[in-house]
Amino acid sequence: METSESSTSDYRQTEGEGEGVPGTLSTAVCEHLRKLCLREFPCGIGSWNKSRFLPQKCRVWRELVPKEEETLVPEEETVEALLGLVRSNHSPWAMLKDASAEDRFLRELAIQNPLMIKDTFFYSYFRSLRVVNKGVSLVDKDLLKFLKLEELVLSANKIEEIDANNLPPTLKVLELYGNLIASMECLCSAPPPRLQHLGLGHNKLLGPLESLYVTSHNWPQLVSLDLGFNNLTDLQNMILGLSTLRHLRLLVLQGNPLSLVPYYRGFTIDSLAHLCVLDDITVSPNEKHQFRGLNIHGDLLAREAQFVVTIGNVRGVLDSSILDPEPGPDGPFISYSYYVTYDFVEDEDMERNVSGLVEATHHDSVLDEIDKHFSGTDEEDQQEDPLDGRHRHRGRQRFHPGSTEEMSKELSEFIAKEMSQMAEGSVESGITEVDWSETSISIHSAPLPQSIDSSEELAKLRPKIDIQLCPSPGTVLFNTVHKPWSDVIPCTYEMKHTLKELIRVKAFLLAGTTVSIVEEKILSWPVVPTPVESPLPAKKGKDNNKKKEPAKDKVHKKKKEPPRELRQDPPVLTVLGSGLVYLEPLLAGEAVVSTVCNFGVVRTLETDRLTHARDSKKVKKSLKKDRSKTVPPTMESGYQPEPLSVEVQIQLHQYRSVEEAFLSLID
């Protein structure tokens, strides 16, 4: 009976005394029966069918009544006409579209034989009771009145605990999907002995003790068990309890943190030999063969999840340099670089064991660190920097939940500390230089003041960071290597994340990750030499030596002028596009989430024309390459700019055989 209710007498009593106890199962059943209107037209007994249910004596007396009075009695409806009123979709008494077959049966029965609608009929006839999304929080003892009840569905309610003593012993199916149950202990005080299916998916089951309640001692006849989308983390102990269920054939554990470990499916299949279906996927003989023997060494397998994040090409980026004026001799010299950021969950053990959190599987993979922009180095300098490891460790910042002001304050304090350290380092190493060439300027680390006392001076050194670059609470921001502009920017980024806090990983997958394309703009200015930097005596000595040199050497010396010194402004970071990548499919059993994040069109016909015009003026040696490039069409009607996009793939690592699992133990 779909969301059916108590008996008719219960309905009358509730109608007279007011509503029943709110939140109880019996109240929800009674309320649903009231909405079926089983005692109102065209159901029940009334002037529309009273003569069919009058006692025999009354009918004999009625035959003696004069015909004149007979005309005062309203005309009664036939059973077929009354049934037509509840069956027709155009009738005001028609059933709702979502009405169940049992609801339709009840209404038709109330027309054909309304005298059967009694307590004894409800409690002895119905074998199925479905109360879905009715706000039920308590299963009361009135449920025991259903003597033949075999199926009880209480999905999408507010049940936190069930008194198993109130469950009929005849139950074979108990579905509690989408409630608030935190432990199975309440069901094990007096579990229905004939139960064959138990559904506890999308509840709040948590803790290692739950494995003690899924044994054959409590559920000797259990064939199907759904524990999906809870917070169970201990796979080994859970499988140990499930292995006692000899009749278990269907099992759902996906959506739990324990299903994120690489050996989840193989270990479960090898441990439960009689299992036929796992997470709605049939267990094949080939799978059983591939994972044979894995359960023997289950305790040695690490309880951690492994993800591989791959970022491919970035397309549709606007080249901002075409909008800047040509630099004069006094600057500013403007450089642009582009990279992609994403946030990923932070492990609690990360600070103590950084290598256990992230393992770079590509030589260009670097950890995103907001303070790293102070270095002002290009890609080659980043690879050659001996302090690169220190920067990467420092970039792992912890962001706790809080207001935006608190986050900004913490970020400012962190940047101030880093600036002080870098200022000391720059004093020891001296002022760095800039390498000039015909086509590019390679800018090294800019000099910093020896001391930072005033807050105003410190504020000038801080980078202008877009608020969108701050990671979500509990996550860390990662980024690809900075790349110069091109029509297609290849990131070639791959990072492996190994995480032990599985509950935090599940929460992160439900929330998703934010992927952003960032533009970094740096302004550089020539450094005016001071008298201390260029002493006169040294120059005179050099001039005397130069007089002795031939004229050809002078020309050669002029070409080898020392590189100019530049100072850099704090980098300006701009988020060109940002969007959320949904990772819930990884929790629901998918192995890979692959998508192209589309942030819309940022380029125009005019900007593409400027870019092409600039590229056509480059060195003649690259003329062939320029000809092969795609030229933007001159007609606006045929112009279709490419949207700003980035290719992202996140893979949940899963073992495909027992050999692969054992190799992980060696590594």
Curated annotation (Swiss-Prot):
Coiled-coil residues: none
Basic residues biased stretches: 390-399, 617-627
Limits of the LRRCT domain: 256-294
Protein's name in the database: Leucine-rich repeat-containing protein 43
Entries under PANTHER family matching the protein: LEUCINE-RICH REPEAT-CONTAINING PROTEIN 43, PROTEIN PHOSPHATASE 1 REGULATORY SUBUNIT SDS22-RELATED
Spans through the membrane: none
Keyword Chloroplast carried by entry: no
Composition skew (Polar residues), residue ranges: 1-11
Cysteine-cysteine disulfides: none
Biased composition (Basic and acidic residues): 540-553
Comp. bias regions, Acidic residues: 377-386
Domain of life of the organism encoding this protein: Eukaryota
Gene3D superfamilies linked to this entry: Ribonuclease Inhibitor
Chain positions of LRR repeats: 148-169, 170-191, 194-213, 221-242
Disordered: annotated segments: 1-24, 374-407, 533-570, 616-640
Keywords, ordered alphabetically: Leucine-rich repeat, Repeat
